[in-house]
Amino acid sequence: MINILTVKNMNNSCFKDLNVAFKENDFHLITGSNKCGKTTFIKLLAGIIESENAIFYKQRDISFLKSIEFSTLFGYFLYNGSFHFIFSNLDQEILHRLDYLDLSPSERKMKYKNLTQIFGLGEYLTNSISDLTIFQKIKASIMLELLHSPKILLLDQVFLELSEAQSKELISILRRIGGITVVATAQDLDLALEFDSLSIFNNGTLCVKNSPLDVLKEDSKLNKVGLSLPFMVDLSLKLKYYDLVDDVVLDIDRMVNELWK
């Protein structure tokens, strides 16, 4: 699998000699200590903050991509507690976005139908956006970013106000869509195992990047940046040390069964 996005020797006020790559069609999670630079990093990838000769889309410096080409490759939603809808309902929002895409009427209709169904928003399209829940607004915001079928979706802090069940549902929706590379940030490690890779930032540097399970086994590195293991992962690793379980067990019922064998 090829790297769709690569950061090479990034040096600025926030990062020093940062090197990291993201594989195509994988889901990548970035977390770390407070003020570790993860939100700034997403803004750099999204082109909100300029960066020259450091970020590459399939070996092409994104700073040289024309704005139209950049907007077709990237979609992003940075959650900061507020939303930026233009119209009073989702139906108008979607149709407005579709007006800017070079699609036939049948393609527009199909995209409208498919995305609203996948995101579970079909019955809320004519409701006032102000009446939607935070979860519905977050799903709607991300759905709008996917109307132009970007190759890369950048998400910052979208899980912050969601329950674990809502967060997992959102990740499941994005996986069902397929064909996109997701780079997302989170405050903690609770959702780490829902992703394909996990990167830990600290003070503008990359501490570790690997498969989530391998990173979660790096106790000393996680402790240095003040991150705590998810409860079931922590319990599994301790029990595995004493040969009470063979691997990480995330389901509590399965854990009980394993211990009673």
Model regions: which residues?
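Conserved beta-strand-loop-alpha-helix hinge in the C-terminal portion
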Residues: T205-M232
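The feature captures the beta-strand-to-loop junction immediately N-terminal to the Walker
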Residues: T31-S33
